[in-house]
């Protein structure tokens, strides 16, 4: 069973995604901080990461994505960047224009449609 690391500081979002992911036969580990996410990444075999961009308590998701992709041990792990940044800030992110600067495989805007999420995961994991 493929293992997904889901990182978000919103516990409600994590719980909703966990139900969706487990229903689709994925093993899910969760982190509400970047620090905990790093510890999980070091100790478990992760197949895919879902990462919130704007984390309130820690370094943001952009920095964590760069850490993952610059590390030989983890750079093969696909990352889905999940965010509401376009809804809650004046910063407007456009994946077509700005995506080349991000070390992630997919950008998905919250709220994420469950069917789109599963289809994206299957595509990234080549299932």
Name each model-derived stretch.
Residues 11-29:
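Two-component/phosphorelay signaling modules centered on CheY-like receiver
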